[in-house]
Amino acid sequence: MNEERLLKVLVGPHVSEKATVLADAANQHVFKVAPDATRGEIKAAVEKFFEVQVSSVRVVNMKGKRKRFGRFEGRRNNWKKAYVTLAAGQDIALAGSE
């Protein structure tokens, strides 16, 4: 795959309580990804940039929340997140983890 495309696939890590528990217990990491990214592209990007073996990728399309801005009602953008399961013995050291 094109390296330029792989740079655009991963938007960043998704940090939440659930993501932290999954990273510790099930060796799964959660990433925000491009809305048009495929499972294969996500797997290739994680393997290339973090130098780990990926065993599976699950993808979820998240609907944007409705929010109020003063008296106006607006909507956040829809986005996509990926649950990446690493092979046994593999680990990703993200900032803030020990």
From Swiss-Prot:
The record's keywords, sorted A to Z, are: Ribonucleoprotein, Ribosomal protein, RNA-binding, rRNA-binding
Offer an example of a GO molecular function term for this protein.
Answer: rRNA binding
**Which InterPro entries does the annotation name?**
Nucleotide-bd_a/b_plait_sf (IPR012677), Ribosomal_uL23-like (IPR013025), Ribosomal_uL23/eL15/eS24_sf (IPR012678)
Keyword match Ribonucleoprotein:
yes
Q: Name one GO biological process term.
A: translation
In which family does this protein belong, per the annotation? Belongs to the universal ribosomal protein uL23 family.
Q: What is this protein called?
A: Large ribosomal subunit protein uL23
Q: Which organism is it from?
A: Thioalkalivibrio sulfidiphilus (strain HL-EbGR7)
Instruction: Give the organism's phylogenetic lineage.
Output: Bacteria, Pseudomonadati, Pseudomonadota, Gammaproteobacteria, Chromatiales
